[in-house]
């Protein structure tokens, strides 16, 4: 009788998503899926459907597609970087996990490769253990919460459920804090130290925070720990929030407003990073690196630099490995060959 193969384990790195190409039709498809999620837009469904289909989707895709085209490099930067992260982590876990079959895969909450489709494919290939690692360092119902929703909806359709473990977030993980601090040190070794260091996180509407979303507190904790690691004084750094959408109040202070105030009040040099993003994308490469640079310089600032996300840096893969390997090992047991 042929012996059973060891269980196959899949680690999924899950990011938010990106259009398939930098064109208005592709962006429209992506935005419709993204902005139709009630986790993202908490407005009565009927009312929001009218706003989305009559006002947002007819006008916004063309403008957003042009922004994507300015940063496109054969594919979306987010997808390119996520694929690189997957390849690096896959090699590390495969080297450690023999004789167990472990593989790492990319998935997206919106767009391709969609999380349910990836799970369907892996399940058909014999995967019976999933480690879900949403690469959102700070939990929010609008990001990680949507991953939980997608997994739940997928699970409702399954007769024979696999084992699933989800990493909620890692906003204060020591390796994450150190990786951020070291990336800032390396950048400043080349570009010098600025008058102000800005930690700009993607914002969420203020009512979401009022209802209990822990995201703002997690962002503040991350920024404070990195600032402490760097030995910064309170007046040398600030936390802010970017990427507002719509007319309602979002969590403050707003990144662009602070930059205008700094530029007009005599602050000459600024460096900015966004710890909320595990991979550079439209919000960092276009909004932070280009738009907000123009905002600061136009207001009177003289020097502005964007510090890249952790992307596929070795220290970032160290972090991803540190979070996923113990979960894989827990299922793989302690057989010889696991390091």
From Swiss-Prot:
Reactions catalysed: heme b + 2 H(+) = protoporphyrin IX + Fe(2+)
Residues annotated for Fe cation binding in this entry: 202, 283
Keyword Lipid biosynthesis assigned: no
A Pfam match: Ferrochelatase
Highest taxon of the lineage: Bacteria
Pathway: Porphyrin-containing compound metabolism; protoheme biosynthesis; protoheme from protoporphyrin-IX: step 1/1
Keyword annotations from UniProtKB, A to Z: Cytoplasm, Heme biosynthesis, Iron, Lyase, Metal-binding, Porphyrin biosynthesis
GO cellular component: cytoplasm
GO molecular function terms listed in the Swiss-Prot or TrEMBL record: ferrochelatase activity; metal ion binding
Compartment annotation: Cytoplasm
EC number: 4.98.1.1
InterPro entries: Ferrochelatase, Ferrochelatase_AS, Ferrochelatase_C, Ferrochelatase_N
Listed GO biological process terms: heme biosynthetic process
Stored PROSITE patterns: FERROCHELATASE
PANTHER family attached to this UniProt entry: FERROCHELATASE, FERROCHELATASE, MITOCHONDRIAL
Family: Belongs to the ferrochelatase family.
Function: Catalyzes the ferrous insertion into protoporphyrin IX.
The protein, known as: Ferrochelatase
């Amino acid at each position: 009788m042929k012996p059973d193969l060891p269980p196959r384990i899949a680690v999924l790195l899950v990011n938010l998503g990106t259009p398939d190409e930098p064109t208005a039709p592709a962006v429209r498809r992506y935005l419709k899926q993204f902005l139709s999620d009630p986790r993202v837009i908490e407005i009565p469904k009927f009312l929001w459907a009218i706003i989305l289909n009559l006002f947002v989707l007819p006008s916004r895709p063309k403008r957003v597609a042009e922004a994507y085209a300015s940063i496109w490099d054969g594919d979306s930067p987010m997808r390119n970087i996520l694929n690189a992260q997957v390849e690096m982590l896959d090699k590390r876990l495969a080297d450690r996990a023999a004789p167990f079959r472990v593989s790492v895969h990319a998935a997206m909450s919106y767009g391709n490769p969609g999380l349910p489709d990836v799970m369907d494919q892996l399940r058909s290939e014999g995967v019976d253990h999933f480690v879900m690692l949403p690469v959102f360092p700070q939990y929010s119902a609008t990001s990680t919460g949507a991953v939980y929703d997608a997994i739940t909806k997928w699970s409702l359709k399954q007769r024979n459920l696999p084992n699933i473990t989800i990493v909620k977030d890692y906003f204060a993980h020591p390796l994450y804090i150190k990786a951020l601090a070291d990336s800032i040190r390396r950048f400043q070794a080349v570009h010098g130290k600025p008058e102000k260091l800005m930690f700009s996180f993607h914002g969420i509407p203020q009512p979401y925070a009022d209802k209990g979303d822990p995201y703002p507190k997690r962002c503040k904790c991350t920024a404070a720990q990195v600032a402490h690691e760097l030995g910064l004084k309170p007046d040398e750094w600030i936390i802010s929030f970017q990427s507002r959408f719509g007319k309602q109040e979002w969590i403050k202070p707003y990144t662009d407003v602070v930059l205008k105030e700094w530029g007009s009040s005599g602050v000459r040099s600024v460096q900015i990073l966004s710890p909320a993003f595990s991979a550079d994308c439209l919000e960092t490469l276009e909004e932070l690196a280009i738009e907000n640079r123009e905002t600061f310089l136009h207001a009177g600032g003289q020097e502005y630099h964007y510090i890249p996300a952790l992307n596929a840096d070795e220290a970032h893969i160290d972090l991803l490995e540190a979070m996923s390997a113990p979960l894989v090992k827990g299922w793989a047991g302690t057989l010889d060959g696991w390091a």
